Amino acid sequence: MAILIDSLSKFYGSKEVLSGLNMQIDSGQIYGILGPNGSGKSTLLRIMAGISQYDRGNVIIENIEAKNNPIEIRRIVGYVPETPYLYESLTPMEYFGFIGSIRDLNRETTERRTRDLIKAFGMEEYSDQFIGSLSFGTKQKVSIIAALLHNPKVLILDESMNGLDPHSAKIFRDLLRSLANDGATVVFSTHILEIAANVCDRIAIMKDGKVMAEGKTSSLVAEKNLEDLFIQLTSSEDIKMVVNALRGSLRNEST
């Protein structure tokens, strides 16, 4: 098991933003977390990435307890935030060199990985331009490549397909599947059913800091009118019908 989350709770002041979450994610699995804005997806992913702390429960990533070992967690995790945070006065090539150095990669490995990933994402023409001059979608590619440089055991993506053109999104989906086939674990958030259905092995649905339903993607996609239900999930305050419609196929669903 790559990720174990046990009774996880997180507070901002007196507000509980994650409430008693339980989750198990296997190695080599692509796991999608769906839910509306404010459901707690980003907070959960930052905790998994070793960036944010939590108040109750436990989070174990690749047999490492996250709360007391954030540096060790960050060494084995690649994390891509929803909004790229990059050094915009550098070129992508300079930035990847910097990332390689802080990841303790030797120069040859950094250059080889950079070259392969730049080619895969069709970024050759942008590699020597200042990051600050690039479009949002191209910056997102830079952020993704940086997260992949050290070949992480766990890749955590927060709405990371936002801004990618269809061709790049397909390349990225194929790359995620290749990583999973090689044993890496991929966790990403989205509110778009189509992305989750095309990519994920399992899906969790979050609302108000809680997991409302969870199961195999094949079971979720098989549900009648699933797309309409997900639209209601992301736009309506009342999602009881979503949970009720899915509960039958999700209950006792094994990995």
Regions found by a protein language model. Name each.
Residues 155-159:
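Catalytic Walker B motif of ABC-type/P-loop ATPase nucleotide-binding domains
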Residues 97, 101, 108-126:
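Conserved ABC ATPase "signature" region
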Residues 49:
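Helix-to-loop junction immediately C-terminal to a conserved catalytic motif
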Residues 57-65, 72-73:
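Conserved ABC transporter NBD signature motif
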Residues 214-215:
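ABC ATPase "signature
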